[in-house]
């Protein structure tokens, strides 16, 4: 295709078709989506689910022998519910994200085709198209410039360079030639036209996107914990059941004379009976409700976090945020407002009205309903005028511009010759070191201005100087004034210093407090930015990642020098892997960082056992976002960054990260509470089955009753405990180690203590009923026994709610609507089962007196827990 011939008219419809066939559409190929059936089957990789499936198939075989399929059906239902809930919520989040991605591809783009300028969707741009861009546009594809008028591009999304000057000539000291324009960069100033040379995956951003979707094998902390728990449960359950099988079988052989005969069918029945008991023990040891509790907790958190501006794309990210020990954050947009503002402006000579005019004229930026369009620095000056109640558009209308000399990197200043109230002025704006050399300044003013500028620059602010002079020559009052004449006026070096200004991208107001909250929670915050060392240092000081003192506390508690906490990308790259491994823990700020530097830092921190979260908004952040345990993209970030992330901060705020940590930690605590409740039920029920076999009675809890206790009630408990709101108290704790077992010593002790006590109470009741009755335990007594067991767990749900706190179980009780609903459901469900269960549940109706007696006597479980928590509160106060 002869591009030169198409510059004026653009491509024809036929050429567009040919180009699309040859080079493809202008769409970035999304990461290979897992098919729905594979996504669903992935849920069966959960180790707890796998144990349940084994138990279900063993139970199925026994069900054909025993002709009782209720238990088998119950286990399969538990598996189906747990896997389907998780699959549904992840699929729902993926759909929402795909919709956002699709909408971004519909952005209108101006192109020249068939000799006309028209707007087409971004995905329709093809190689060879002539694309027109101006201030505020996002570049839709890679290309080479053919028209360039003061074009400045924000390449920070790809190269980290905030403002890159473009020209028709190649070369330059940037990452790409100056005549090359790249997809997903933003036009900050000027206008231009370019020929598209690459679309879709062939663009530079497409190449980065491909790298960001490389598969990594970092296991999440929760998955490791569940794997460990599943192995422990399977070992304990297997050992206990096998031991019980042989103990009871040997006891029967030694005491039952039938073993001396030849009734082999009867002996096989005895073996089958004990084998059934062993399998029942294994099934009871496995917490069927745990996968449901986890998926419900994650799904509820996912929905709630969306309301607090966190769009969670992957369920595991909810919990993993609670285990985070390091947050690597970029600066622009996350810590700062990504909005330049005038921090200080000192008038030196002339009046304010003349300065207002100078600011309005020496700018190519615009404000659209208060929203800045164009160069960020010039936009900041217009916003400053607006804040002073001055209308820059009116100021521009009141003057007659004779000649304007645009800003260039060579001149480092901009000049405008204009007629104001019948007088001609030359207004100049630019770098202070350049502008002040062209001024006549008194020594005192020069020293004072130099000191102020130096102070601002050390605070990582961008500085500007304004100067002017009154022109007496009448010939200058024509529109034919040449550039050379304006340059000659500047070279006279007789300007008057009008003002100096400091412009900064201010820190978000809530960031310092959010950073401190994270640090108090034991989470190290590291700033990784492409800015200069001085700017990065100042940002670090402002948000509080380190203090102003020469010595600071390092990540391991040791004193670390400020130099040790600062590093540049170049210095980081020069370190060997061993040196980088040692240095990683103390780095607080990395300046002049490139994407590979950020990714290497994440890898080194993970190697040290840290759980790492990474924030980023640019395409250059995508690889690090993907490699981290949790990738946090910004709502205003590029589509590639969002695609690589696990969670999107819709409000771009670092405060949302602190909230996500709180949600994650609260979720983990709720899971621990559920485990405590569930395993107490399982331990007590398991011991009861063993105990019932010892005294020779039939199983005190039937299969259907066990299903109610173990499955339905546990699902209710999962709902109750998963729906507990997050607590700020968790932010006072240090991060847990990824290697720490989810059941710590105190929880483990509580499970065994409560489980054994509940068993002893229930076993004593069983023995009492056995010995009191002449013909064994009747159905009425077994109904009382069953209801007592359920009510003990009912009251223990309150203790689970208050687990790992000194507070009463009734704290914020009326706000816990999910808990209240579940308590009502358990009571109503138990009454229905007892009253109408009949032969299916082996129950008979109880009188009101019996109900009140059971409810009142079992409430001791709650009051004992309240006394223990009161005692702990008293001890804590004394300390």
Language-model region placement:
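Long hydrophobic segments that form regular secondary structure
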Residues: 767-768, 772-773, 777
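Alpha-helical transmembrane segments of multi-pass integral membrane proteins
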Residues: 749-765, 791
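Transmembrane alpha-helix entry/boundary detector in multi-pass membrane proteins
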Residues: 778-782
